[in-house]
């Protein structure tokens, strides 16, 4: 007979009650301690349930009940400080359900907790008015003893702290760890708890807000959020989030009603709806409270057999609505870990338990740190943290398509999530979640990012450095200047093609790579060998976080994808024809820079025309699919074929003469150094790109084989063809690894 294993959950919030249901479903013995007299008090405002949490709630059988008392977020609205609409999309809920299987729903915290509690079968395992005062742990593998304020004692194999920001379990874990293993808890865990914002939350009845959906109102150093309650109830949840004058370190005591009233009076005239001010909303409110918004993510969330989850382990800014959903994710992961340990007969194996909890700690630290950073960025933008954020919020983002500017960013918060492995799977949408993907993106370490930036920089500088070290040469190679100029121009076609493709990726929308034209203009002015390394270094920096790979990696504009090849032919027709005819026109070299700049403009104009004529599909079916890949393939293949033909022709005609001149003579010519720098950069970029694909498990191709192919193709076909080929290869690998299957089919292969 198996040795009994008991879990003691401290805290009856979303995390604790969800975990209790999961442990029952998996057949584990547990007890739950809650210090309040009611497991579902009518306190707090609302809870937002996003697809990553909804799918787990569906697995444990409470989602349908939640929906009965919840309001779906069908539309997205954002208002300026003057009350004008800057963003409106009535299809948000429909699109989210299509993509991820579930809409966002909003319900009262009371109803959420009540539904979770009602689902629990063994209600005798729930103990109210049990405030934990002390925890004792023995040697690894021994049981923990938990004492409560009323003198009760509980024994468990694993104690899970889910008792919120002001956690007694966390305090006990720190006390025990500091006593037994000083330094185990990093100082930044204790000093990293900070409150940057304060919120006033409330519930209003018939305040005059439009029914359905949610609304956000932007303002200087503050923002607002409103959401309708159950349809037909007339109830609206609202909140004001305002930035503190200075960040407050540590756990913040509860704030007074006087502080709340001061904020309400200060911002009473703020427009938060059409014809509605904060003062008017407050007059219609039946409940309001003030809370400090504390933020932190602990590096250490367990010691021996004490584990922290939910707001005990991390506290996120609520603007992104991921607090409760992250708690549900953590509960599901704990339940899965215990199931797997039981399957391996390792529940009482101290080493096995430590390893499992370490993996939990590492995974959740990465996940919740990303969520915290994302939420903080959203709040900074909505509250105009600086002039740049204000400009983006009011003048840039509202002009971008909703499916490009918002849905991919929302999706990147949902799709890294797990669900429960050992229960029937939840509903699936068009986008895969992390467990369904071959790729396993993790954040790249700062050291790796810096190392690759240094590597790319050295590659760019290498030819120039060698030139300085080698003996001076008097040869100027006058007969080869036109050859070098032509070769540089052909390489620039491949480089600008890469830039244009990348500029249509949702993951680079708010980055220096959002448009290719500035980079091309800079290259024409300063030189391609000076601009390309800067671009590639920015790309390395932009892709270091997990969110980059959970955002669609393909072109968001099918019209632009279809226009790539025709526009390439149009833009480069004149310099191409003049070159093919061996023209001696002195203005030939002037046509290439013009063509480089014309190409992205033609792509943009063509895509705008195609969208205006409704000649291409639009919306989520394009943004979240790889339907653009066939058009990218044709485009990059054309570049590879033409550039390799130029490479082979020039090598055939001039290779022997160039070899006779020698390295010293070649590197004495500036154009030759430019070519060498670009070639070294392209090889270095290919090396980095294959390493990155291996790092995120997007390919199983060995690095030695991949790097050999890059070097050989660069020598035989030229760097421009090598760049085009490596770019397309990486797109195909990402498409397979992220399971982004086409949602619409290309039309008869015509572009």
Swiss-Prot record:
Q: In the UniProt entry, which residues are flagged as the active site?
A: 218
Q: What induces it?
A: Expression is induce on medium.
Tell whether Phosphoprotein is among the UniProt keywords.
no
Oxidoreductase in keyword set: yes
Detail which positions bind FAD. 34, 48, 109, 311, 324
User: What biological-process terms (Gene Ontology) are attached?
Assistant: terpenoid biosynthetic process
- Listed transmembrane segments: 8-28, 446-466, 481-501, 508-528, 563-583, 590-610, 639-659, 663-683, 706-726
Annotated membrane topology: Multi-pass membrane protein
A Gene Ontology cellular component where this protein is annotated is: membrane
Q: Known EC number(s)?
A: 1.-.-.-
Gene null: resulting phenotype: Abolishes the production of arthripenoids but leads to the accumulation of a new compound that possesses a sesquiterpenoid chain with adiol group at C12' and C13' position.
Alphabetical keyword list: FAD, Flavoprotein, Membrane, Monooxygenase, Oxidoreductase, Transmembrane, Transmembrane helix
Needs which cofactor? FAD
Pathway annotation: Secondary metabolite biosynthesis; terpenoid biosynthesis
Q: What molecular function terms (GO) are annotated for this protein? A: FAD binding; monooxygenase activity
Q: Which SUPFAM superfamilies match?
A: FAD/NAD(P)-binding domain (SSF51905)
Q: Where can this protein be found?
A: Membrane
Q: What is its main location?
A: membrane
Instruction: State what this protein does.
Output: FAD-dependent monooxygenase; part of the gene cluster that mediates the biosynthesis of the meroterpenoids arthripenoids. The pathway begins with the HR-PKS atnH that catalyzes two chain-extension steps to form a reduced triketide, which then primes the SAT domain in the NR-PKS atnG to initiate three more cycles of extension to give a linear hexaketide corresponding to the polyketide part of arthripenoids.
PANTHER family documented for this protein: FAD-BINDING DOMAIN-CONTAINING PROTEIN-RELATED (PTHR47356:SF2), FAD-DEPENDENT MONOOXYGENASE ASQG-RELATED (PTHR47356)
What is stated as this protein's family in its record?
A: Belongs to the paxM FAD-dependent monooxygenase family.
Descriptive protein name: FAD-dependent monooxygenase atnA
